[in-house]
Amino acid sequence: MRPRRLRILVACEESQAECSAFRSRGHMAFSCDLQPCRKGGHPEWHTQMDVRPLLKGNCSFRTQDGKPHQVKKWDLVIAHPPCTYLCKVSSIHMVKDGVLQQERYKSLLNARAFFLECLDANAYFVAVENPLPMARAELPPPSCYADPSWFGVKYTKKTLYWTKNLPPLVAKVVNPDARSFMHCSRGKYRSRTFPELAEAIADQWGNYILDHPP
């Protein structure tokens, strides 16, 4: 079945790390985020909008350069939904003095609904990324995990994936001296996708899909 140009949506990605990795391999990948793509990025590959209409496929959209696009169905959807209200680390803010914080709990429910909507994207191959969730989020068990140190990065950052019809990522060049990325970074930078991990995703999952068409 090779070669074939895959139609790929990378949801909630303004860095374009994964989008660029797939593009460099000849695939038709688009990133989508509420924010514009990073300065120096590729606006011709990025659409700034709510991603939910795109998750269903059979969609029309414009990239940041103003060019219209139409996709009947995605081959692969990778999503990075916000983890602010879902992750285990944030659970300490959910209850104060023994009282459930209702506004924060509502935000958790909204975040959970969006996460599940990403997981239910209209594509045969799907991967949703997030850190370890709090029990209160009641997310399904993750399918696998990966770590950037598996691909030579000097930091460790365990990343969970909820997948459909995709194999776990396989370590290639493990960095034995890697240290925790969580302890030396903050905010949005902490949630970044390392280029080495993005390259591994494009290689391993891209090739798997080409070799195992639905």
Name each model feature, range by range.
Residues 1-214:
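Conserved active-site and SAM-binding loop architecture
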